[in-house]
């Protein structure tokens, strides 16, 4: 039987344990297992925002744009190694929904003559809604499932299932789609900062993701887009904004896209949000994705073992190589449980129809948090 002392022993031996002290945790009695929805705030974030406010905005005023202009690409270069991308292949901008729209539209443009978009019927809602909207506007067909790809222009997939945490074989599925002549847009929102992934090594050409979950970038933090360097000269995204223009200050009559990743941008970036996101991204870079992934696998492994111990059902894969950094607990009263536990300071989240998600954010989640959280669920289930 796993005991609380076992969890405390794992915490004592955790090579990443010191990172938790670098986050603002005003109430240590709160058990937070929802970093897969919103990460905790790093202490450095407030300091960094104060610096940008005082030194750049208040003191530098408009002159600060001299070093703000390329900030989306600079922060993208900090993020790039976390996903196996190269310098100049990632840019932070806008939000995930808009970036999905851009990437899918751009991918369609690279496959003329094809008019089918493939996506899972139970993928994350915003991805499905965007795909449906694009298909409606262009007169395309939406196919739910990936068995037939020979007539597909673009396949849209999440790396990790947002409910069960099942991890897709990105390399194999990318190769299969490319062999059928289809483009692929990968959504890494539940993967970035959680698993050690090599987009270049997997042959991925287009990907998007957020920075407010495992990267701890803050609520509403900017999303990001990855475009493999070999596509930079040919990819055309559908929203032509001045920030993506080759000479943005020429104010010319026509749009000519920039020759690099910045062609995926739109308008003026949110500098304060970028500054906050950079702090969280840099912390993950400092810890290193191999160590983060290893701890995430151990945390979720403990959660699954505790589910077994308490007789709680979970659809999350037991093979650590096939799951992300949350564990789904199924119960008919899941929604009521989450509401009651939240009131007690034990924070999970709920997903329809019957899932309690236990998010394990390796830089902040302790093994004892997992133990106490699952024990609290078990007490409610036993009533």
Predicted segments with their positions:
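Pyridoxal 5′-phosphate
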Residues: 1-383
């Amino acid at each position: 039987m796993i005991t609380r002392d076992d969890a405390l022993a794992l915490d004592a031996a955790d090579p990443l344990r010191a990172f938790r002290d670098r986050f603002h945790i005003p109430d240590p009695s709160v058990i937070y297992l929802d970093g897969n929805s919103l990460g905790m705030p790093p202490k450095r974030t407030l300091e960094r925002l104060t610096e940008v406010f005082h030194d750049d905005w208040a003191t530098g005023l408009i002159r600060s744009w001299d070093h703000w202009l390329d900030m989306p690409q600079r922060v993208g270069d900090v993020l790039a190694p976390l996903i196996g991308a190269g310098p100049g292949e990632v840019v932070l901008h806008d939000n995930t929904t808009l970036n999905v729209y851009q990437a899918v539209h751009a991918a369609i443009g690279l496959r003329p003559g094809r008019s089918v978009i493939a996506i899972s019927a139970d993928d994350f809602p915003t991805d499905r809604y965007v795909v449906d909207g694009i298909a409606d506007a262009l007169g395309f067909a939406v196919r739910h499932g990936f068995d037939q790809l020979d007539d597909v222009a673009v396949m849209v997939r999440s790396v990790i299932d947002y409910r069960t945490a099942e991890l897709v074989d990105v390399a194999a599925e990318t190769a299969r789609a490319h062999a059928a002549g289809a483009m692929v847009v990968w959504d890494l929102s539940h993967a970035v900062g959680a698993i050690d992934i090599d987009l270049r090594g997997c042959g991925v050409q287009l990907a998007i993701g957020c920075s407010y979950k495992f990267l701890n970038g803050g609520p509403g933090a900017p999303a990001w887009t990855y475009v493999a360097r070999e596509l930079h000269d040919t990819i055309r995204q559908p929203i032509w904004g001045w920030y993506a223009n080759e000479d943005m200050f020429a104010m010319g009559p026509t749009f000519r896209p920039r020759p690099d990743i910045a062609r995926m941008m739109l308008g003026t970036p949110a500098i304060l949000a970028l500054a906050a996101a950079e702090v969280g991204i840099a912390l993950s870079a400092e810890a290193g994705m191999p160590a983060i992934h290893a701890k995430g696998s151990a945390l979720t492994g403990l959660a699954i073992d505790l589910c077994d111990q308490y007789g709680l059902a979970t659809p999350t894969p037991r093979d650590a190589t096939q799951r992300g950094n949350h564990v789904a607990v199924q119960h008919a009263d899941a929604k009521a449980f989450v509401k009651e536990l939240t009131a007690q300071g034990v924070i999970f989240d709920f997903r329809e129809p019957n899932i309690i998600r236990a998010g394990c954010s390796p830089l902040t989640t302790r093994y004892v948090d997992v133990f106490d959280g699952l024990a609290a669920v078990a007490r409610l289930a036993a009533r």
